[in-house]
Amino acid sequence: MRVRLELRDLPRFSLFPGQIVCVQGQNPSGHCLVARRVVAAAPPPMPTSPVSSPAFGALSMAIASGPFTCAGDLAYEPFDAMLAHCASTRPDVVVLLGPFVDAEHKTIRGEDDSHPLEASFEEVFAFGVRDRLEKFLDASADAGYAPSVVLMPSTRDATHDAVFPQPPLLADGSVEAPAGVVVACAPNPGTFTVNGVRVMACTQDVLRHLSAAEAARDAAPGGDRMARLVAHIPGQRSAYPLYPPARDACVDAALATHLTVDVTPDVMLLPSDLNPFAKIVPREAAHAAAANAPPLAGEDASAEDAFVAVNPGRLARGNVGGTLARVYVTEGAPEPGKGGKQPHVIAKRARVDIVRV
């Protein structure tokens, strides 16, 4: 039976199509449910590790999201600038999020008559991304620096399947790396562990899609809309909780099980066309925003029950360079006197810089 949902008595809510909610209220007329309380989140637990785990050690990451070249050419100058930044600052991990060969680039689309494309999409990826990355890794090895690299595709990648969720971009060994250097190719969305720290990434612009579809009311002044949108992902236990999906999302519902979020990550990477940001997000933020409950601000949340969300922005924006993100995690001391597994408390130990290239 379908009935209309009346939200006038709720001071705060955040709802969108496809969201799974529990509504408490009354239906006196039989055709309108007057909500008194809405529970819209059941986030999974935060990760924990033994006190001897490397998750309590220091860590640095550089994160960039495509496009990796400017709109007017295929010179990949912003990518060169990013690799130069990494060579000088030496992050432990370099995370590269697609698109690498942007299907929306006018040259790739065949719309640039002055510079027609004379190479295949695979050749563009080879000279624009793979060769540069291999040269960077070889030079780094010669200098005694061995970063790990993670690559994740986008539905806008002209060299890959335009379906979401996506398999990894390359097969293992496609990027020739020096001995001891790890180059991992992750699916989209994907979760990977770096020195014990759990990182989740998704190159689908889920924040922009949720922002366009959300209906919300927030009676509290200064509410953080971006943190609220981010919290819907663990709250709904899905990397893409919106249904029906946005028209450009390329979602294959038959593969929905690959969107499941079974653990709230320490760090969540959500590249978007929206403004770059870094936020501490309480795990229960989506519940507080949707229910008749007091607001939760990042500063007030327990660091043990919060995660770090990062939108690094786009490495290239139009004809100019864009931004990348640097994540620094300081060494942490497990709580004395407690054995077994403990939370990583990354939200308390992390600093994020948005760097312009």
Label for each model-derived stretch:
Residues M1-V357:
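Extended recognition/assembly regions associated with phosphoester-bond processing machinery
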